């Protein structure tokens, strides 16, 4: 009996979060269907979970950004500059595709906005003005109010200043970031319980139409990711290697993407990508740097998730968005996506930063994060699959282009 109890506790603490979230999702749907009155009473679980996310997210962004900048070391000289350019291009194009998809298929979300205060900007000038005001905000107020633009500004400034600090100071900051990340991991472990409360209460109050909205949102997200994987990325690779990119694209999706889909971790998929690069006889000095770098900053999937969910919230609140503001959202989403690997909740906990552009309160933004967690069983897997397969795809494209250039130069010299 004691052994079974220990096994159950181990499963709760160390078991697959995807499976646990799926169980919470199904349990919430069943409770709302069988006992709607009871389902409404468990809404406290969802409220507590969203509150915990709202409390930890500002501190997480601040300490992680500051730590990563303070502990940055100058990289060794390799051929990663063209790969880095492809990473940046791919991430930006992913944000553009997501924004375009959200405009073509605008989707509302079921959010509790009755008591929330909103101050939507009127145009791009107001957005930029608001961003500049938030940049120079008091850092304590920025943390208290969830002003992510101000948090980023202070974290970057302090990180740059601390690059000249003693190694012991940098080590302390790194340890602090690890500690905060551990706290976030604990909060995320409660996601199944929180989602159980959120789903059951939402369906009990709004009916099963709320689930249909989640399915539609998931379809838009996955469609944008498929467009990136099968259309935009091949075009980028073709621009680099000047020949049919699809054999390479499908090889990367098959060998790297499928594994990443189930591991749901770009970092965990690094050995898979390294082994694939080795089998393709790519330059070891290049892929040994570009693959870990890609796991950190190449976040096409995150660049899709952030604007799709942000614009879904914007549509729900009836905030008008013009083309310049949409382009600015693409840039902000691409920048946010590059930092998604350092966040335990992935891209979802960076959604409030994008939402702040439109005057959406932190309270509503965290409800959007909760919606993201509900669909996260598939969304996070697809996002990681796109992220990780693109790492090896762009690395292979640059290495092959470099080999072609060297071969061409040798032929020219012989002639």
Swiss-Prot record:
Catalysed reactions, as listed in the record: L-serine(in) + Na(+)(in) = L-serine(out) + Na(+)(out); L-threonine(in) + Na(+)(in) = L-threonine(out) + Na(+)(out)
GO cellular-component terms in the record? plasma membrane
Report keywords, A-Z: Amino-acid transport, Cell inner membrane, Cell membrane, Membrane, Symport, Transmembrane, Transmembrane helix, Transport
Example GO biological process: threonine transport
Please list every transmembrane segment annotated in the UniProt record, as residue ranges.
15-35, 45-65, 85-105, 142-162, 193-213, 217-237, 301-321, 331-351
What does the sequence similarity comment in the record state about its family?
Answer: Belongs to the dicarboxylate/amino acid:cation symporter (DAACS) (TC 2.A.23) family.
Which compartments does it reside in? Answer: Cell inner membrane
Q: What cystine linkages occur within this chain?
A: none
Name this protein carries in UniProt = Serine/threonine transporter SstT
Name one molecular function that GO assigns to this entry.
Answer: neutral L-amino acid:sodium symporter activity
Query: Which Pfam family is an annotated match for this chain, by its short name?
Result: SDF
Report how it sits in the membrane: Multi-pass membrane protein
Function of this protein? Involved in the import of serine and threonine into the cell, with the concomitant import of sodium (symport system).
């Amino acid at each position: 009996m004691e052994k079974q109890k220990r096994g159950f506790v181990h499963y709760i603490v160390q078991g697959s979060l995807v499976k646990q979230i799926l169980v919470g999702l199904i349990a919430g749907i069943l409770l709302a269907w069988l006992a709607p009155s009871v389902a409404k009473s468990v809404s406290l679980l969802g409220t507590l979970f969203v509150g915990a996310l709202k409390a930890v997210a500002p501190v997480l962004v601040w300490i992680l950004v500051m730590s990563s900048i303070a502990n940055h070391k100058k990289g060794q000289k390799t051929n990663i500059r063209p790969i880095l350019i492809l990473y940046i291009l791919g991430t930006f194009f992913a944000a553009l595709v997501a924004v375009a998809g959200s405009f073509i298929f605008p989707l509302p979300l079921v959010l509790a906005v009755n008591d929330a205060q909103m101050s939507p900007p009127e145009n791009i000038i107001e957005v930029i003005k608001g961003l500049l005001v938030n940049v120079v905000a008091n850092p304590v107020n920025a943390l208290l109010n969830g002003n992510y633009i101000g948090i980023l500004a202070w974290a970057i400034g302090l990180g740059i200043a601390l690059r000249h600090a003693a190694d012991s100071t940098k080590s302390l900051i790194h340890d602090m970031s690890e500690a905060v990340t551990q706290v976030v991991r604990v909060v995320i472990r409660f996601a199944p319980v929180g989602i159980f409360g959120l789903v059951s209460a939402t369906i009990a109050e709004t009916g099963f139409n709320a689930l249909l909205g989640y399915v539609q949102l998931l379809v838009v997200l996955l469609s944008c990711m498929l467009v990136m994987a099968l259309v935009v990325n091949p075009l980028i690779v073709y621009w680099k290697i000047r020949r049919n990119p699809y054999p390479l694209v499908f090889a990367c999706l098959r060998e790297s993407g499928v594994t990443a889909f189930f591991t749901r971790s770009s970092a965990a998929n690094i050995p898979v990508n390294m082994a694939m690069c080795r089998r393709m006889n790519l330059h070891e000095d290049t892929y040994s740097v570009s693959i870990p770098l890609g796991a950190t900053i190449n976040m096409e999937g995150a660049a899709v998730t952030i604007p799709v969910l942000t614009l879904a919230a914007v549509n729900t609140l009836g905030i008008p968005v013009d083309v310049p503001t949409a382009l600015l959202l693409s840039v902000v989403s691409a920048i946010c996506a590059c930092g998604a690997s350092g966040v335990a909740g992935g891209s979802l906990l960076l959604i409030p930063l994008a939402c702040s552009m439109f005057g959406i309160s932190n309270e509503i933004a965290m409800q959007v994060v909760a919606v993201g967690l509900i669909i996260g069983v598939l969304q996070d897997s697809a996002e990681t699959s796109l992220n990780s397969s693109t790492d090896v795809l762009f690395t292979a494209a640059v290495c092959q282009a470099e080999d072609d250039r060297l071969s061409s130069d040798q032929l020219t010299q012989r002639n």
